[in-house]
């Protein structure tokens, strides 16, 4: 940074002057000078607190609350006495009148005081902004930001680099802590910074860095530029956007944008159905891009496709341009896409952000990350009882012992290992990791200890679960198995005898159904137990197991022999190296190809998948669905057949995938319809944990509310809507550390079992549960979490339920929030919107409006706001509700004493206690149904105006008019509460495009969706065109002999009358072969047209403005004629080509030159197959005079079209405007200087994805076995 020094005497003078000036005014900053001052306007702050100031409430004639005029539109008022703690409403009245409704015009502002306080109010007349000191703290005058740099002298704002003389003082006229200053900047290059105050003590430069480098500013032409400084982030920027023209081999990365969460850039939001159209858009600096393309990978078809995008227009302020493509897909799949952007020699790529969470993407020089788009079966759905359910997961052995007679039904665990039975229900699970430590009493054997919990115990506690609000129970495995976890199935056809009998199972199912509870079973179909009737490693079963028969020398004798791969040395494939879990063989890539296994699990009449849903031909006695273990380690087609099978018993029965990551491919509609949402768990933990922590499943690092929202929105965006509302949103499971222990409390650990640790952990659990119960999906409670059970990693995460020793206060909390969920349909199937995500507070909104939920089902109107505050202090947040709900909607906080809240002025202010949350539910009976969306909207373009009309909407008392420059978004409301069904927009510029949409509003303020877009192009009527130049006949054809300039004129009253080119006028010269001349025979044999090319229509070239001819504007163009005799005309449009006015058509003869010899034909080589490109090469042609250029033509089955021209020294061309899987034909035409032309041969090619050979070289230790497995995802790889 460069700084000039001045004498202390001078600085002292400046400081004294500033002190004198500022002493006369309040603490608010000065504003930029505006064209007109508003000192004559009287502004009153009025509200329901005026009585405390010796006035009457809402008194617009008050002389007590008149605001002091500070200058440049700014008013200020500070209460002379403290206002009492409480909630108040207020607004600003102008000139002692309610004309215009006051400020703001719609609704009142809210003031919440937790203590008696003086309050200062501010009003900016120029921006119509109002705020108060509870929401806003201004920078003091002596620290006001100001511009300093070489720009000062250019704008008359003091001496360069002298903050003491800078008069470029920035102000905050919207009260949002963003300070601005506007000045007229001459053309030139500048450097500047921002200082706070009139010294260098605190200054900010590039990227908002304190004492950072100077900021560069290059101004191409004189311009009014606004400079901005954000007092919170210290970022500095301008609104300057120089106009780009032509190719500059540069792309402005900062202006590129694609945001998958913004419906303007991706519409509709989230996963789409097969056949549904998704619109994708990308933003760039206006006139920056030469072309934009999308490249996407189809995860199912394993194909990559590149397609061109279309430039659809520019932003209303002219700063940005937008490119668009519409896509639809005819099959379920997952799409990965990014954008390829070109400007001359520069190529940029725009893909997802580094975390690949969707939302706002990132520009890079090379391909980086792809955005994700899920396409699912249009008939995909889930049972309504899944959506918004409260689920309860039970580990049967540890829940409740209802039948002690089966406690010792078995004596052996795996092989000959004994069963270790706990006679004390309150023992901790045996953890062999602790063997050898003081106090350890276990036998050191894994998974062989039992407590006696059983199916009857669950049945006995159904009333408890019903009282907890549970509507779905998920049972860990219950089939015969040697272990306590039972993920090592010994016999799929039997209930484990320590859990009960088939009759106990049927009774549990029937009793649960009678109480409105559905039950999900756990299916383990990737592996079995080695101690099973199927493998029978230890010979405990009379049936011939696969391993048993292998030992006898013939594995095929066993009916289960083909289920497993057993090597000659007795080793076998097992799950993650555990020899207790032999894996089912994947034959030719799928377990389903093992016929006997597929029949046993899926195909047979009483196959396992179907039997347990209907064990006795009474559906009420069967389970309701399956949770399926390690599903991503089983071939997908196995699961599609599994789905088909269970649909024959209970259609759309749950298939819940155990998938710890992105389960999009599992949720396309052909198999799974839900997933264990471990991502939800991890996101909630990261938000609440407060410190880095490894819970045994992965590292947790703290995030703020904005990152939490980004992560949760990523899940919402990827999953089909029915699946998203049916995801199993868990906080813990049998595979994770207890959620209380994750949050710092473990009753069995002296270092973590203090009352303070428990209190803090329970507070965090309550926060997590509030959000879980307010969020779409199945809110899953892991047994005992609600009773205060803690526990470390497996096996400590499977402690017994503390019957008789529950944390009853925590149980009551769970009962309360689950009842709030169950009693309010809006929390089950209402739509979802993020309302607030800043720092420590996260808030979501749920709605059932217009009488419909997120799935179009009919329910009474309702709304909810759910928010959590993780900070140690109370938080007051103000939520913008303008796009969520109308004013006047009232809520009660059902967690905190039914405290009332109401939306006013397009916002709602909510008080959230420290380390707590709120669940606001709208009061019953409120009308949230909007009028019908306006239809038959018509925009009629006129001269300087657009006339709109539409049909009356039932229930509407008014209409809002929205306008944009592009279809589908960027709308600005230009009129409110229009009472009729017509509107005239006169605030338009002729020649520009305007897009309109209209919404209907009822008397309460419910606003409908916007109507379908309608487009208008206001324009001056073109009154006359003519004076087209007549080209002289017998024009000799030659590359060096273009026609003379061809002129024409246009007159449009009001547009061309004034000096200079009429704005937005387009002129084009058109030409085509007209035939019927004496030279046709010559042209047919020498200057022949390219075969297969349609040249029957006009070809158009742009004409240039020349000057004024009286009241007319004159334009010109010229032609290089390449064949035959020509007809030509000129056309004009001042409405962006929507309509044209043409001159008369003239013609002239083109005659051949002395050179009638055609070039030799180029030989076009057959190109190789490549993905999304075709690379052409050819042999050079020869000619008696020389080759002028080569023209490249392409056909995709119809006529040939010229796609490029290259010089005479270029013999190759790469066509990237192709689509994989489409067949193209190409030919090259050689032309000489007299346009004698000769075609090459035709080649045909179909671009496609090309497999490549990859060799992996791995260095391993000497003791490594001969075979090494390579883990990963390699679609369609051939080894």
UniProtKB/Swiss-Prot annotation:
Molecular function GO labels: alpha-amylase activity; metal ion binding; pullulanase activity
Residues the record lists as binding Ca(2+) 1: 248, 250, 288, 343
E.C. code: 3.2.1.1, 3.2.1.41
Reaction equation(s) it catalyzes: Endohydrolysis of (1->4)-alpha-D-glucosidic linkages in polysaccharides containing three or more (1->4)-alpha-linked D-glucose units; Hydrolysis of (1->6)-alpha-D-glucosidic linkages in pullulan, amylopectin and glycogen, and in the alpha- and beta-limit dextrins of amylopectin and glycogen
Binding site for Ca(2+) 2: 401, 403, 406-407, 452, 454
Segments traversing the membrane: none
A GO biological process held by the record: carbohydrate metabolic process
Family classification: Belongs to the glycosyl hydrolase 13 family.
Identification of the protein by name: Amylopullulanase
